[in-house]
């Protein structure tokens, strides 16, 4: 075991170590200047790009949320407006129904009054015609009675005959 450090130290050349160390430092400096800076620049660009994309996505998400809320508000307003329109249409329909019913009642009353007036008029005409017939029959009967002097029974029989004739002539 005591020979092991001697073996390790025997093959070391300090000049080679220093040369390799200097070459390594120069290589690291060159890598840093020509490879690491562009690599870090590319990584920084990529990081900025990803950050911008995330920021843009967040802004779009916020805009989408805002638009969604606006659409919800518009939809709610449209529903309320349609509900109001339906209610107004129902009220107008009820009002028109009542107006139609009222107009029908008024027309019915007018027709009833017209019919009553017509009935009264025809009744009066019938009574007037009947009075004329009664008057002419009375005159006719009276003239016949005057032509003949009859006893009561014959006079009654004569009146019945003339009334019967008058009824048949109608």
Curated annotation (Swiss-Prot):
GO terms for molecular function: proton-transporting ATP synthase activity, rotational mechanism; proton-transporting ATPase activity, rotational mechanism. One of its GO terms (cellular component) is plasma membrane. The chain crosses the membrane at residues 11-31. It is a single-pass membrane protein. The keyword Metal-binding does not apply. F(1)F(0) ATP synthase produces ATP from ADP in the presence of a proton or sodium gradient. F-type ATPases consist of two structural domains, F(1) containing the extramembraneous catalytic core and F(0) containing the membrane proton channel, linked together by a central stalk and a peripheral stalk. During catalysis, ATP synthesis in the catalytic domain of F(1) is coupled via a rotary mechanism of the central stalk subunits to proton translocation. Component of the F(0) channel, it forms part of the peripheral stalk, linking F(1) to F(0). F-type ATPases have 2 components, F(1) - the catalytic core - and F(0) - the membrane proton channel. F(1) has five subunits: alpha(3), beta(3), gamma(1), delta(1), epsilon(1). F(0) has three main subunits: a(1), b(2) and c(10-14). The alpha and beta chains form an alternating ring which encloses part of the gamma chain. F(1) is attached to F(0) by a central stalk formed by the gamma and epsilon chains, while a peripheral stalk is formed by the delta and b chains. PANTHER family: ATP SYNTHASE SUBUNIT B, ATP SYNTHASE SUBUNIT B', CHLOROPLASTIC. This is ATP synthase subunit b. It comes from Bacillus pumilus (strain SAFR-032). The gene is atpF.
